[in-house]
């Protein structure tokens, strides 16, 4: 399995399905909103994938790759993992483990203003490392706060294919930009 799930779908720039103010606070490091968003995301995710989660022997959760400073999505992932492990414990399952996609970033450009092709070109110069032996054959949840162009997912899938990593992969997002008519800088 290789699929994605997003809690909120952004179809219009004028009608955001979540509080933009709260999201801004979250992006600037407010952990309370990270915790609230993680709970909302977890609850919605479990409605769709709860039965599949309970069938897994081992679950690996991977936050979005970052260089050295944890991002807001990293905190979202941490709180999501906390919710997941509480659920697993209450169902007599093993706790999810965390792995990391290591990234050596090669640019200082404002990534947020780029479209899909520009993003892929830019991040293709970065180097990535993933412990394929650790995640191989496992059910992996790759978590990020928002899917804008899909370049992150594209790059991670490319890495998984290059390293011939076998397993089940689900990309989980708090929000996803659906309309391609909206500029990525939204």
Protein language model features and the residues they cover:
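A cross-taxonomic marker for long C-terminal extensions/tails that follow the last structured domain
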Residues: 132-170
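PRPP-dependent phosphoribosyltransferase catalytic core
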Residues: 2-18, 154-186
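Short hydrophobic segments within beta-strands
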Residues: 62-64, 143, 172-174
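Well-ordered, non-membrane alpha-helical segments in soluble/globular domains
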Residues: 29-48, 73-87, 153-158
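Short, glycine/charge-rich flexible loops or terminal/linker lids adjacent to PRPP-binding catalytic cores
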Residues: 87-139, 154
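Gly/Ser/Thr-rich loops at beta-strand to alpha-helix junctions
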Residues: 65-74, 146-154
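Active-site-facing substrate-recognition patch
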Residues: 1-60, 66-70, 107-132, 186
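Structural alpha-beta junctions
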Residues: 82-97, 161-170
């Amino acid at each position: 399995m290789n699929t994605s799930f997003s809690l909120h779908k952004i179809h219009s720039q004028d009608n955001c399905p979540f509080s933009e103010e709260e999201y801004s606070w979250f992006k600037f490091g407010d952990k309370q909103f990270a915790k609230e968003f993680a709970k909302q995301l977890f609850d919605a995710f479990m409605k769709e994938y709860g039965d599949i989660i309970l069938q897994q022997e081992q679950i690996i959760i991977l936050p979005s790759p970052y260089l050295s400073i944890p991002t807001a999505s990293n905190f979202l992932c941490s709180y999501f993992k906390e919710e997941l492990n509480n659920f697993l414990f209450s169902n007599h399952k093993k706790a999810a483990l965390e792995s990391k996609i290591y990234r050596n970033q090669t640019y200082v450009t404002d990534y947020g203003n780029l479209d899909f092709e520009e993003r892929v070109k830019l991040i293709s110069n970065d180097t990535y490392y993933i412990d394929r032996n650790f995640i191989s054959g496992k059910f992996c949840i790759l978590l990020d706060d928002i899917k804008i162009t899909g370049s992150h997912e594209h790059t991670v899938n490319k890495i998984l294919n290059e390293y011939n990593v076998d397993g089940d992969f689900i990309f989980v997002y708090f929000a996803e930009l659906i309309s391609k008519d909206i500029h990525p800088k939204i």
